[in-house]
């Protein structure tokens, strides 16, 4: 079972209210009056309980407010406690605008957790040639706080009415460049991240920085040219991230870049069996160019492991736990064959018939990738790790829920999550 399950739940819940999963039959009216939208706010809260070996018996609650003061804005809160003493809290605010015609969208996320007897891969245990039993079991406090200021560029389909263009759940593809089609944006995200082990934890030697907290700025450049945000069948999505942490008395400067590229091809129907077939392909690669830079005062200009380039988790190498592999650089490939069966019985099933479930999807997927201590294309394509699996996904009240099983060299993992992985 995924050792960091609750952190994944928090992140997934945040995605639930993001711009990418507005209900396809519920477009955002950003020009509605604040008074009417506030009175029509959608509020929901869900208690949950689960048990795993690492977490113990866990209980919590998550709540969401859509149209929170503005028609396109949302709020999310989540928290849990366990019988082992672990606790987690999460609070997020998304898509707030200065005015309906503004090109800026603002948000914030605040996550804190105190974890007891958790599995961590640090030092050599996080390298590509490591083994699963090299983990340590430790207590740690973790945090990730960040603000977001997203500017929607006046090109492509966002030349006019930028917020609607960015948040509308579907769009017509009108070209193959950012100037012709899709929505392009720049997102500035100042952040603070920390992982503090208890004082009696014996940590192995590591090639990374040893500071237990870091702050800096993440800048995202994104071009979204998907035909639909919830379940794309055509187009592409490109995201390039630059993360920089400055020199301070408590940390050394470092920077890294990440490129995440996805494509989608509509393969059409298959007789009376499948209403839709889609082949989706994703490439992710990243590097830390400051890795070998050094000076007498600070040593090597490298991030701490928890802020480094990682593989494993919800989106890449899905048969491994989150952050299983960490290095200077990484490359990862994912392929999915997604089909929508013509047979759709969910509306007649117990529990499902309480909700609007317009479609479901069957998926076969495969991932390969690895981390390395240099950005060497040949090395990054040797001794690659792999994952393969299957998934069933369905849209519930406008939200894509994915249940998937992944197998790999070390273990198999079953997950329930929201949103497409790419």
Where in this protein do the model-derived segments appear?
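Transmembrane beta-strand segments of outer-membrane beta-barrel domains in Gram-negative
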Residues: 26, 31, 50, 111, ...
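N-terminal signal peptide c-region/cleavage motif recognized by signal peptidases
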Residues: 18-20
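Transmembrane beta-strand segments that form the barrel wall of outer-membrane beta-barrel proteins
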Residues: 42-51, 61-63, 72-81, 236-246, ...
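Residues on the lipid-exposed face of transmembrane beta-strands in outer-membrane beta-barrel proteins
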Residues: 47, 61-65, 91-95, 147-153, ...
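Outer-membrane beta-barrel translocator/channel fold
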Residues: 79-154, 272-314, 324, 379, ...
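C-terminal outer-membrane beta-barrel translocator/porin domains of Gram-negative envelope proteins
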Residues: 217-352
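Outer-membrane beta-barrel initiation region
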Residues: 24-107, 116-118, 183-201, 206-233, ...
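Transmembrane beta-strands of outer-membrane beta-barrel proteins
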Residues: 43-45, 73-77, 103-108, 184-188, ...
